Amino acid sequence: MGSASRASLDSARRVLAELGGVDLSTAGQLLGAGRAIGGSTHLLSALADTGIAPEVKHSIVDRVFGATVQEPALRVLRAVVDGRWSSHDELLAGIEELGIRAVAISAPEGTPVESELFTFGRAVSTDDGLELAFGDKLGDPEAKSTLVHRLLDGRASEQTVVIVEQLVQQPRGRRIGELVRHAATLVADQAGLTIATVSVASPLSPEQSERLAQALSRRYSRRIELNQVVDRDLVGGLRVQIGDDVIDGSVATRINDLRLQFA
């Protein structure tokens, strides 16, 4: 995201924070408004046009969404259109991020939204049929939404369902795995956490997980949430990825390094 878009997003995030608590209905309305804006080239162009005065854009937002969107979501949308966005896609990305953060805020304490997203993403990535169904660019968004409900209703929180519905209905050219990982990162960040994806040959015990999380928290000066991926090809040891940082202590990598040394 460009610097202008990042500054605009930061400003809109402050407005979201000033709302205090938001409910899931408000968060869903914000995401729905983003989909509506993305589905109308004329509306998107008008709201992203830096030559149109903010008060005129406010009027457009109120006229289009005033009857269906509650005031808290309207306040966030007005803050979005007040900003300068580097591209139309980044404006839509900004609304989506704000909506996902609003969903995270709406979750009751202890709701495992981030881990549910991680589990869903892993399930899709290991099922070619699901990946194809969600990744089909010509697929009906409503059919994808129906599939989300069939897979997640009764198995995941309402918050997770709302987020995944958003991702499959407005992918904007992104793959489902990328979408879910990014959403999980936003949910964790909203809770003050950083995600560490830990690949291991066999599952860590609760005690090992706790020690690793504490060690990583000290290293990064931030609370760390572990997501485990079992990969038998690692043979032993583990590989940790936090953002762009990779700590690779797997036996497979050490063996490969030795092979290269003796090649």
Curated annotation (Swiss-Prot):
Q: Name one Pfam family in it.
A: OSCP
Q: Which UniProt keywords apply?
A: ATP synthesis, Cell membrane, CF(1), Hydrogen ion transport, Ion transport, Membrane, Transport
Gene Ontology molecular functions: proton-transporting ATP synthase activity, rotational mechanism
The protein's topology relative to the membrane is:
Peripheral membrane protein
Q: Which InterPro entries match?
A: ATPase_OSCP/d_CS, ATPase_OSCP/dsu
Name the predominant localization. membrane
According to its UniProt record, where is this protein located? Cell membrane
For this record, an example GO cellular component is: proton-transporting ATP synthase complex
- Entry similarity comment: Belongs to the ATPase delta chain family.
Tell me the NCBIfam families matching this sequence.
Answer: ATP_synt_delta, PRK13430.1
What quaternary arrangement does the UniProt entry report?
F-type ATPases have 2 components, F(1) - the catalytic core - and F(0) - the membrane proton channel. F(1) has five subunits: alpha(3), beta(3), gamma(1), delta(1), epsilon(1). F(0) has three main subunits: a(1), b(2) and c(10-14). The alpha and beta chains form an alternating ring which encloses part of the gamma chain. F(1) is attached to F(0) by a central stalk formed by the gamma and epsilon chains, while a peripheral stalk is formed by the delta and b chains.
Role, per record? F(1)F(0) ATP synthase produces ATP from ADP in the presence of a proton or sodium gradient. F-type ATPases consist of two structural domains, F(1) containing the extramembraneous catalytic core and F(0) containing the membrane proton channel, linked together by a central stalk and a peripheral stalk. During catalysis, ATP synthesis in the catalytic domain of F(1) is coupled via a rotary mechanism of the central stalk subunits to proton translocation. This protein is part of the stalk that links CF(0) to CF(1). It either transmits conformational changes from CF(0) to CF(1) or is implicated in proton conduction.
Q: Which HAMAP family match?
A: ATP_synth_delta_bact
Protein name per the record: ATP synthase subunit delta
Q: Which gene encodes it?
A: atpH
